[in-house]
């Protein structure tokens, strides 16, 4: 049980959110993997929101207990989420409170919380404007044209979805969004048949140009709508607070989003998540090691504060928060959503690259950053497909190589799922020049799973692969088959059993970036480009048909 918070201001109103422990976590996990396994009798038998509530949500008694606790604290408008996993109440900051129940930061005392509370979060109406010391990302390079990329993957230029039920989605908070005029210009420039009428927002927030996440949203929209031609594309921005753009407000926004989306009566079949940062476990390890090695030059608190000044480096509050986000991703897989996400742009060591400056803290962090592997989140989650990056050697589309920043490695927090065990053991057993064994978690979830072109980041490759899977889902719907849902198990089974058919192996590259050690690309799966880049004929053969 953990209490966490966003920066607290003198705002007049705020909310407390109690995230409840799952009522049946073991059963939820077992069902997820059964529904995801093509060899299981339950394969692709996705569940409704009502069915999911009994697994992912808390018990009715726990929800009632949390609601009573919030009311006792002075909360009003107490609401239980549709999935039964959260209880929210509104508070007036100016109201009189019993000081014995609250901390100086305006949070309930840990000793007073009900035992069923997995996480308690404070949402403030107002957030401080963020100031970060790493420059904003410039407009990304696009690299090869859409049609050249399609040709390299064997995808017909004008192959498009034809079933009106096919829906794909991209999400981000803060300034995340796009302008239809820019998408129209991109359509003409790239000679790609994007159906502009089927690209729409599903929220009242439409983003704001000039922000880093607006550029992210624009890239996501053009990629997924170009590769998932004619599928309905939903653009979702569920939280415009400035704290969600670059800092720890992002983790709260993602937790809210995945929890809410899984509770909807209707969900998209494909969701691409390009944004992320180092995982909270990586951030903790980074500062723990740096502080230890610095010999008193700075404190652990100072190190953690420094990381919060770095753009999109540590955007999640805690491992406990990440576990709840994972529960939401698990729920989405059970609903029939294929979730894909960027593997990161800093190889195995960074969020983007080394820390800037010559002070004691960045110097120590850069040393530790190269000594250990620091996975990102969310794409190394066991419950989504992680997408790495490739480029073309000498601009030759027949010679794919790993993109220089393609993120990859092994999660510190999550163990490898069963479908990875044999392949990962083979990679670690046969590959020369691996990083020191103490620098990574050999039993962790390996990532990425597959890759695609990333001229200037895996934020390009994730929606690309998302769009491709939308075409596969469309073919399945037209054939009377269910959507794919979580596809990781099937990807690994197909790639291992039919090497080179659905994914073209990429054997050139390394995840070391600016450091002197990293994971090398090799024959078969590797933690640089995964199983390689898409091959349409194999994909439609093995994913567009039964089961």
Regions found by a protein language model. Name each.
Residues 2-79, 88, 93-342, 346-347, ...:
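Substrate-binding/charge-relay-adjacent region of secreted/lumenal peptidase catalytic domains
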Residues 81-83:
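Short, glycine-/polar-rich solvent-exposed loops and beta-turns at beta-strand/coil boundaries
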Residues 195-197, 235, 340-341, 386-388, ...:
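Acidic/polar loop patches that form or flank catalytic/metal-binding clefts of enzymes
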Residues 349-357:
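Active-site-proximal loop/short-helix segments
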Residues 352, 382, 386-424:
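Polar, glycine-rich mid-to-C-terminal structural blocks
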Residues 427, 437, 473-527, 547:
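An often Trp-containing, charged/polar helix-loop segment at the C-terminal end
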Residues 460-473:
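Active-site-proximal alpha-helical segments within enzyme catalytic domains
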């Amino acid at each position: 049980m953990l209490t966490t918070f966003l920066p607290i201001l003198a705002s007049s109103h705020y909310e407390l959110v109690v995230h409840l422990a799952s009522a049946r976590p073991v059963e939820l996990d077992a069902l997820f993997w059964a529904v995801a396994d093509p060899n299981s009798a339950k394969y692709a038998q996705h569940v409704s929101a009502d069915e999911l509530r009994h697994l992912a949500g808390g018990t009715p008694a726990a929800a009632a207990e949390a609601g009573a606790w919030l009311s006792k604290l002075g909360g009003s408008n107490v609401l239980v989420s549709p999935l039964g996993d959260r209880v929210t109440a509104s508070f007036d900051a100016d109201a009189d409170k019993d000081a014995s129940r609250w901390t100086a930061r305006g949070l309930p005392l840990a000793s007073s919380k009900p035992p069923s509370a997995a996480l308690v979060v404070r949402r403030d109406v107002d957030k401080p404007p963020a100031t970060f010391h790493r420059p904003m990302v410039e407009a990304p390079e696009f690299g090869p044209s859409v049609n050249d990329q399609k040709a390299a993957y064997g995808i017909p230029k004008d192959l498009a979805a034809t079933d009106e039920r096919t829906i794909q989605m991209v999400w981000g908070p803060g300034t995340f969004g796009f302008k239809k005029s820019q998408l129209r210009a991109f359509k003409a420039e790239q000679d790609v048949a994007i159906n502009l009428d089927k690209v729409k927002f599903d929220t009242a927030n439409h983003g704001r140009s000039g922000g880093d996440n607006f550029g992210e949203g624009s890239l996501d929209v053009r990629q997924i709508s170009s590769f998932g031609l004619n599928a309905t594309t939903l653009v979702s921005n569920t939280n415009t607070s400035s704290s969600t753009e670059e800092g720890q407000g992002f983790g709260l926004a993602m937790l809210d989003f995945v929890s809410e989306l899984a509770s909807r009566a209707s969900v998209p079949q494909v969701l691409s998540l390009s944004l992320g940062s180092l995982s909270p476990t990586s951030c903790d390890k980074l500062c723990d090691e740096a502080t230890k090695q610095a010999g008193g030059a700075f404190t652990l608190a100072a190190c953690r504060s420094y990381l919060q000044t770095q753009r999109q480096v540590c955007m999640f509050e805690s491992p406990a928060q990440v576990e709840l986000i994972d529960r939401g991703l698990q729920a989405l897989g059970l609903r029939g959503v294929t979730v894909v996400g960027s593997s990161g742009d800093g190889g195995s060591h960074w969020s983007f690259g080394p820390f800037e400056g010559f002070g004691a803290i960045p110097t120590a962090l850069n040393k530790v950053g190269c000594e250990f592997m620091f996975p990102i989140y969310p794409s190394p989650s066991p419950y989504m497909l992680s997408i790495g990056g490739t480029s073309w050697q000498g601009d030759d589309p027949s010679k794919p190589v790993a993109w220089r920043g393609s993120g990859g490695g092994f999660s510190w927090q999550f163990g490898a799922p069963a479908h990875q065990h044999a392949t990962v053991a083979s990679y670690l057993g046969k590959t020369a020049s691996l990083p020191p064994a103490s620098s990574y978690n050999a039993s962790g979830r390996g990532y990425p799973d597959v890759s695609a072109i990333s001229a200037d980041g895996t934020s390009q490759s994730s929606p690309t692969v998302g769009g491709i899977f939308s075409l596969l889902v469309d073919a399945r719907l037209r054939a009377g088959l269910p959507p794919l849902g979580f596809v990781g198990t099937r990807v690994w089974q197909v790639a291992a059993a039919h090497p080179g058919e659905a994914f073209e192996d990429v054997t050139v590259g390394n995840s070391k970036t600016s450091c002197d050690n990293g994971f090398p690309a090799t024959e078969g799966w590797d933690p640089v480009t995964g199983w390689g880049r898409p091959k349409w004929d194999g994909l439609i053969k093995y994913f567009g048909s039964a089961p």
